Amino acid sequence: MTVKTRSNIAKKIEKDGGPETQYLAVDPNEIIQLQEESKKIPYKMEIVWRNVALFAALHFAAAIGLYQLIFEAKWQTVIFTFLLYVFGGFGITAGAHRLWSHKSYKATTPMRIFLMILNNIALQNDVIEWARDHRCHHKWTDTDADPHNTTRGFFFAHMGWLLVRKHPQVKEQGAKLDMSDLLSDPVLVFQRKHYFPLVILCCFILPTIIPVYFWKETAFIAFYTAGTFRYCFTLHATWCINSAAHYFGWKPYDSSITPVENVFTTIAAVGEGGHNFHHTFPQDYRTSEYSLKYNWTRVLIDTAAALGLVYDRKTACDEIIGRQVSNHGCDIQRGKSIM
């Protein structure tokens, strides 16, 4: 990332008709300082073999589930598995990401409870833990304080970061982040306190019981399709944002940073693949300029807003986006991001 150019990015966003300072905006001086510190401290990745074994077992189980989904499962189970993937994805995209990590909109208590339940289906750490890592990623992108630092390679950014101990800078900088907004949310406090039983119930037990009870699917098929395969697929959809959406795509909004626009990840992660836009305007609740047919998460948020469950949706105004593209991006490439 070219820090000097990155510092010129527009940091204004619209809220209730007026601009405010962009949340999680990058501080170029802080980035330079972290990069200099990293040069002085030798670091060797330490593999966590327990995690390696668990992920290996999960992928073996997911392979069984994929076979069952294609050749053995009832059509109701196939649809149910897809719906669980979509709504579990919403628990990450609309919940942990856009609402709680970026504060890009506000939600009523019923909506926050709904998103917390969906987040349990996804099983990607409790929201407070997830949001802290994600805020580190945005504040210190591509430094050693970034949990899935892309300078360590595609595999590390994708899932390797979960197979090794966190870099000391991730822990040190993460401890400095203000997480009081999340720690004071009773919905998230409840989730953190009861996380293990909640995720076992929402991610595995209910996805197994529901097909068995309602359409007489076998427990074996239900567990491996709606449970393990769906869970593993959702993980990779999320991980592709950290990897593929930093490597393969175009940069309409800021050519100096690693995040790119990637249609595949937009589809796989229910609307999250406009990553160059998102890192340029991290508090825009839309996360991209993609149309609603690609941005399913925005559809959910807008629908909830129409029902009075969501409010204060923040967006970057067209004038600021246009100026940013003209100064640091590419108008032609922007056209590919408005589909």
Curated annotation (Swiss-Prot):
Pathway it works in: Lipid metabolism; monounsaturated fatty acid biosynthesis; Lipid metabolism; fatty acid metabolism
Catalytic activity annotation: octadecanoyl-CoA + 2 Fe(II)-[cytochrome b5] + O2 + 2 H(+) = (9Z)-octadecenoyl-CoA + 2 Fe(III)-[cytochrome b5] + 2 H2O; hexadecanoyl-CoA + 2 Fe(II)-[cytochrome b5] + O2 + 2 H(+) = (9Z)-hexadecenoyl-CoA + 2 Fe(III)-[cytochrome b5] + 2 H2O; heptadecanoyl-CoA + 2 Fe(II)-[cytochrome b5] + O2 + 2 H(+) = (9Z)-heptadecenoyl-CoA + 2 Fe(III)-[cytochrome b5] + 2 H2O; (11E)-octadecenoyl-CoA + 2 Fe(II)-[cytochrome b5] + O2 + 2 H(+) = (9Z,11E)-octadecadienoyl-CoA + 2 Fe(III)-[cytochrome b5] + 2 H2O
Tissue expression summary: Expressed in the intestine in adult worms and in all four larval stages. Additional expression in the hypodermis in all life stages.
Any one GO biological process: post-embryonic development
Enzyme kind, highest EC tier: oxidoreductase
Membrane-spanning ranges: 52-72, 77-97, 195-215, 219-241
Keyword match Phosphoprotein: no
Membrane topology (UniProt): Multi-pass membrane protein
Keywords of this entry: Fatty acid biosynthesis, Fatty acid metabolism, Lipid biosynthesis, Lipid metabolism, Membrane, Oxidoreductase, Transmembrane, Transmembrane helix
Subcellular location: Membrane
Cysteines paired by S-S bonds: none
Listed EC numbers: 1.14.19.-, 1.14.19.1
CC per GO annotation: endoplasmic reticulum membrane
Family according to the record: Belongs to the fatty acid desaturase type 1 family.
Comment field (misc): Cytochrome b5 CYTB-5.1 is specifically required for the desaturase activity, its knockdown or mutation alters the enzyme activity.
Domain text: The histidine box domains may contain the active site and/or be involved in metal ion binding.
Protein name per its UniProtKB record: Delta(9)-fatty-acid desaturase fat-6
Lineage per the UniProt record: Eukaryota, Metazoa, Ecdysozoa, Nematoda, Chromadorea
